[in-house]
Each structure stands twice: as structure tokens, then as C-alpha cells.
Amino acid sequence: MTKPIAVVIGATSKWQSDGRNTRMVHGGNIPDDELPLSIRWGVGGAIALKFAREGFHVVLTTRSKPNASALEAAIYSEGLDCMTVELDLESDDSISTAFETVRSELGDPEVVVLNAGYLEGRDLPPEMELLENMPVELFETAQNISSRGPFLVA
């Protein structure tokens, strides 16, 4: 019997030890081993680990495969199954290619978790925090990631 498949869209977090937002909040680099495994990759990583531990073959999606390498290694280290597929929610072709890869290598997913987010604009200078000051390009990207992309995934 094959394992059920869970695709986690947005499986990696921008709050990794070398991430821009981690440095912004904590004032410097934090070694990975100082971040507990349970929070190292944020909600997406926690969801991926949970599904893997429950017997699913987990597909980690991220815009760049290296972003998921540590999470993938952690899942493999527990003897669990996963694979990483590049997926950019702003690209129709990327979405199609990612799911073609999943289907050809594993089969149809039973679960798709939409966890992608977009942080830009949250760290605008205080004098620009109002929505009216947000550049239209940031708004369009946020809409593509949170609305249009998931629609295309479905």
C-alpha cells in the first residue's frame, strides 16, 4: 500500500536563522541549533513534520529548493518520507509544473495545505505604515500569493 500524499505549499519559513526578518527582530544571526526543531521552520515546517509523522509522504514546496534542505534532512533523519518541489505561487507555469512532478512521481495528493505568506510591507518605516502608503506592487504580490495562487492550485 502506498502512503497518502500531503503537499505543503509554503513549507519553509522566512524566520530561518539567516533570514532577513530574524535578523531584524533579534538583531543578529542565530545559529540553527539555537532554534528548537519545533519552531525552526515555522508553521509550514511544523505541519510538514506532523503529516510525515502521521504516515504521509510529504511534499515540501518552496520557491527555491535549498530553502527546504534542512527541513527535508530533519524529516529524513526520522526515517520519514518527503520530497521538495519548487513552486512559485506567482507563476502559472510553476504551479502546473510542480503538480505535474508530484503526480508523475508520487500520484495524486490527498491533502494540500496552503501556508504561503508574504511579509513585504510589514516592515515599512513608521511614517508609511498606513495601507494608503503601501506600493501597489506589494499589494499585487500579496494578492497573487494569498488569493490567485491558491485558486490556481485548486
Where are these regions (language model features)?
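Canonical Rossmann dinucleotide-binding motif of NAD(H)/NADP(H)-dependent dehydrogenases/reductases
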Residues: 1-59
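Structural signature of the Rossmann-like NAD(P)-dependent dehydrogenase/reductase core
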Residues: 8-10, 114-115, 146, 154
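The beta1-alpha1 cofactor-binding region of Rossmann-like NAD(H)/NADP(H)-dependent oxidoreductases
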Residues: 66, 86-98, 136
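Hydrophobic/aromatic anchor residues within beta-strands of the central parallel beta-sheet
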Residues: 82-84
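Hydrophobic positions on the long internal alpha-helix
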Residues: 98, 113, 142, 153-154
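Glycine-rich phosphate-binding loop signature in dinucleotide/nucleotide-binding domains
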Residues: 102-108
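Catalytic Tyr-X3-Lys loop
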Residues: 110, 118, 132-151
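Conserved NAD(P)H cofactor-binding loop of Rossmann-fold oxidoreductase domains
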Residues: 115-127
